[in-house]
Structures are given as C-alpha cells and as structure tokens.
Amino acid sequence: MQMNKLLGTCLLCAWAWGQQANAQESIKVGDTTRNMITYAPEGLPYNPPLVISLHGLNQDANYQKGQANWEAVADTAKFVVVYPNGVNKAWDISGDTDIKFLETIIDTMYNRYHIDRNRVYLSGFSMGGMMTYHAMARMSDKIAAFGPVSGIPVDYRNPSGGRAVPVIHTHGTADNVVYYNGDANHPDGGYGSIPDYVKKWAAFDGCNMTPE
C-alpha cells in the first residue's frame, strides 16, 4: 500500500513537471521579482546546455519566443531555453540590474536541470542584442558564446574573463533602426558601423582579420 502511494506520488510529480516544460514563471533577483518563460524538452539529458534569448525594446518574452523559436532545435538537440522579460520591456544595457538577472537564471537552471555551466549561450535581438554585448563585457566567464542580432555595444569594453570569446553577429544591411553602417548623428551620441565592431572583437579574439 505504501509503495503504491509512493509510486502514485512520483507519477503525479512527473506529470506536473511535464506540464511545466513550457512555463511562464517568476524568480527572485535580490528583492525584485522577475519573469521569464522556460522551455525544457522531454528526454532532457543530464548536464544539458542552456540558451537564453532576449527580446528587443518594447517587446516581451512571448514575442521573442514566437520569433526565435528555439524550441524547434531544443526538441532534437535537447537543451533548455529561457526567454526572460525585461523591466518595462527594456534592458539595463549599462548597469548591473540585468547582469544579476542573467546570473540568477543560470543558477536557477543549474539547480533545476543541472545544466552544463560550460555550455551556457546568450543571444538577443535589437536592444536584446545590446544586452548581449553588455553581458559579453561583464560575464564572459559565465557564458560560453554570444549571438547578438541587430544590436550594438553601447559601451565597448573587452570581456571580463580575459579569454577569446566566440561570437556570431547577425545584422541586416537594410536595418532602419540600428543602421548597419552606423549613425554618427544618433541622439545618444552616435555609433560606428557593424563591421567595425565585429573587427574589434575579431582582433581581441586573435582571429585572422582576412575572412576565409
């Protein structure tokens, strides 16, 4: 009888866990409650990778989830995906607020799924791409590789970890918000071209400056 109760409890817990594989949830970051969407595919192995995907300005986690659709890859490659929500649909791209949020996400996913801390990846669109660059400078010791999309570094600094940082930057040449060729007259002080930023990272990483 006790064994049947135990088995029933285990089955119930497993069912409940499965229902939360694609869940909106809240976590505490210091004294603040932050929100995110977490996706964990069935059959997740021990020590899986983690992908964190950041939305753009005036967007949210639901929108980013629909656009990025990491689940289509996660289902076969077996990794965890987190879509965080920025405060007021924006990111702190120069301070510590969202750096702490990202660190807490990584710790939470480690405690829950025992994710591989050496295979944590960060990507983001537009302002989320800017936050990705900010994280490259501040927490390259905690994130293995970065994939900014249509974003720029607002405060260019070399990574804190002192290592070559794998990065793939995706940007449309016809982008009419964050211009591919830069904008010297931008109200916030102007910014350079995307190729110039990429060359800086390539130089830091010790890459051959002539593309193969």
Give the role of each language-model region.
Residues 173-212:
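Active-site-adjacent alpha-helix of alpha/beta-hydrolase-fold enzymes
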Residues 94-114:
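Alpha/beta-hydrolase active-site loop
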Residues 58-60:
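Serine-hydrolase catalytic-loop signature spanning alpha/beta hydrolases and amidase-signature enzymes
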Residues 78-88:
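Conserved alpha/beta-hydrolase
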Residues 19-50, 62, 73-76, 80, ...:
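A domain-start/cap signature at the N-terminus of enzymes
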Residues 169-171:
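Short beta-strand/loop motif that positions the catalytic acidic residue
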Residues 1-24:
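Bacterial Sec-dependent N-terminal signal peptides
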Residues 53-56, 83:
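Structural cue for short, hydrophobic secondary-structure segments
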